[in-house]
Structures are given as C-alpha cells and as structure tokens.
Design a protein with these regions (language model features):
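Cysteine-dependent hydrolase recognition
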Residues: 1-354
C-alpha cells in the first residue's frame, strides 16, 4: 500500500528503468507532495513561508514524481489532511525542472456524486474518444479581464502564432474562434455556448482564476453618467462588504472616500441589505464561471488549457479543472496550474509541439 509519496516514486522509477515508462496517471487519492523552498521554480507564486500557513504557502506539485533528478528533504505529514506531505527542495538538488516522464491526475471532485462513479464515467468517455478519428481542427481562445495587462498589442499576435502552430484550424472559416473580455458587457454566455460545441477540440483560457472560479470579465465599460454612478456604487458596496468586519479598515475606507474622492456614505448605501447583496451577487456571477455551472453546461472541448491561477489546484476537494473532466461532457484533458501563474507572457509558446 502507498502510504507516502516515496512509496509511489519508488515504483515509478523502477518501471522507468525496467520498462522504459513514458508517463503515469494518478487515479484517486494518491499522496500529494507539498513543496517548499522552491518558489523560484514557479512563475508567479511568491508567499512568505515563515508567516503564512503551511498549506497556503506550499506548492502541490507532482514534479516530485516525474522529475527524478530533483531532491527533497521530508518535513512532515499534515495532521489533518493526511494525504499532504511537506518537503523542502534540497540544497543539493538541481534548481530547474526537467521532467523524465509526463504525469497527470484523475481525481474525483466534490460534486455530490460517488467518486468511483465519476472516475468510471471518465474512463468510459476517454475510451470512446480514443476510438474516434478526430483531428485537431476546431480551436477556441478566450482572453479575460486583466490578462496581458489588457493590452491589445499583446493580445493581437495570438492569432498569428496559432496559425503557425496549428495551421489546420485555419483551413476553413470558423474553425478558429477568439473572444476577448470586452467584446460584450458580459461574455460569459458566449463562452459557455462555445464550450458546449460538440466539435470543439482545443480551448485556451487566458484569465484570472481560483480553485472554485474562472474570472472571465470585470465591470463593463460605461459611457453615460448614470452608468458611471451605478458602477462606482457597485464597486464601493463590494469594498465595504470586504472591510466591514474590520472597524479600522472600514473607517480608513470611509476616510479615503471622503478625503480623496469627496464621496459620502450614500455611495455604499445598501451594502449590508440582504436584497442588495443578492442583487450584487447575481451581477458578479455574470462575470465568471463557478464549479456548479461547469457540471451544468457539460463542456465538450476535448482539451482545455487554463492559463490562470489555481484552476488546477488538486489539493482541494473540488476545483475547476477537475470539474471539466468529471462532467458529462466530452472534455477528457485539462492542463492547469495548482498555484499562481505569470500573466504577462507568451502563453502559447511551443504549443504546436502538442
């Protein structure tokens, strides 16, 4: 029985040497290495390990398993979440990642369905997809609010790089689709409708994210004074709710509103009214995709790449990337990050190698 990551890695290395193992898929609750002293090998995750909780300041990573050269010093097993094992990257270890094999996880999510039933359905649809001769010729890319610092200059070249990397998707009109967060006030429905397409092969999301949410868009641009006012009130109500449990912080917010912008408390009126809270919550929901919605709309894109923070955080019982593959749709593969990822970069570099 595999009680700790070392047990799993020992089997992997043995198979690699004996049978030239190319990769592994971890099915179920395989021990999760929680890595520390290795933030220099992440693109954006930077958190003080001394003054923050171990769970939050460690990186869940299977590089422990698939990069045989990396060396680690065992620290402890989590006393509450027993599947977590904490390690420091050893001083004598290589300080760069060069994986010897590929690795992936098939992990049930907390959607109310029995875990074994989820995994069984997943493998059935994987087998079904492998039996179909389906070439990659339908592509979709979405760029959310905040990605590339909202630069049109940085966003525009994606069409040219995709054309070079996957020329087949440009053979006919409509095979490659690109949507940006400001194409409409709330592009969420357009994105979901795209993901529901039964012919969609590959999708990429450039966005902000959390384990439980894809952040698609922000507050829509306004061009009339009454819309400006409504947008500002919506923003300050949200700010007030975030600070209401800290009197000092709340008072500082009121001072800032008054002394910097000349705004009185009428601009946050209703921030603690249940009716207004519900209305604001529904408006906020239009700007992103949450876990339950993934299960509802059943994404069919065969592969989805999440160029986003935390959408692939497999230490959680439920997370966006897991919901995609465990849905009843045809999605069978996701590529996502377990922690923060750098936004301002060429995210599609070498994508054509797939």
């Amino acid at each position: 029985e595999w009680n700790k990551p070392e047990d799993v890695k020992k089997v992997i290395v043995k198979l690699y040497k004996k049978d030239k193992l190319e990769g592994v898929v971890f099915v179920g609750d395989i021990p999760i290495p929680m890595l520390r002293k290795a933030q220099h090998m992440t693109s954006a995750f930077k958190m003080d390990e001394k003054n923050n909780d171990w769970r939050d300041s460690s990186v869940p990573s299977d590089r422990f398993y698939d990069d045989f050269d990396l060396q680690f010093d065992f620290l402890k097993q989590d006393s509450v979440e027993n599947n977590f094992f904490y390690y420091n990257l050893a001083i004598k270890s290589p300080q760069q990642i060069r994986c010897d094999i590929y690795s992936a996880r098939v992990k049930a999510v907390d959607n109310g369905e029995e875990p074994h039933a989820q995994i069984s359905r997943y493998f059935k649809k994987v087998v079904a997809e492998h039996q179909i001769n389906n070439k990659l010729d339908q592509f979709f890319s979405y760029t959310g609010d905040g990605s590339y610092s909202n630069s049109l200059t940085a966003w525009t070249p994606e069409t040219f790089t995709i054309r070079e990397q996957m020329p087949g998707v440009f053979d006919k009109e409509g095979r490659a689709r690109f949507i940006r967060y400001n194409f409409s006030d709330y592009p969420k429905d357009d994105v979901i409708n795209m993901l529901k397409r039964t012919d969609l092969d590959l999708s990429i999301f450039h966005e902000h994210g959390m384990p439980e949410r894809q952040y698609l868009s922000g507050s829509p641009a306004t061009n009339r004074w009454n819309a400006h006012v409504d947008a500002m009130k919506y923003y300050y109500r949200g700010l007030a709710r975030r600070k209401q449990n800290n009197k000092k912080s709340f008072d500082e917010m009121l001072d800032m509103m008054k002394n910097t912008y000349g705004l009185d408390t009428t601009w946050i009126a209703g921030y603690d009214d249940p009716k207004v809270i519900a209305e604001d919550s529904l408006l906020d929901l239009r700007t992103g995709i949450i876990l339950s919605e993934v299960t509802e709309f059943k994404p069919n894109s065969r592969m989805v790449i999440f160029d986003a923070c935390y959408n692939g955080d497999f230490r959680e019982k439920d997370y966006i990337a897991g919901r995609y593959i465990m849905s009843e749709g045809k999605c069978v593969t996701t590529f996502a990050n377990s922690v923060n990822v750098l936004q301002d970069k060429m995210a599609n570099e070498m994508l054509g190698l797939l």
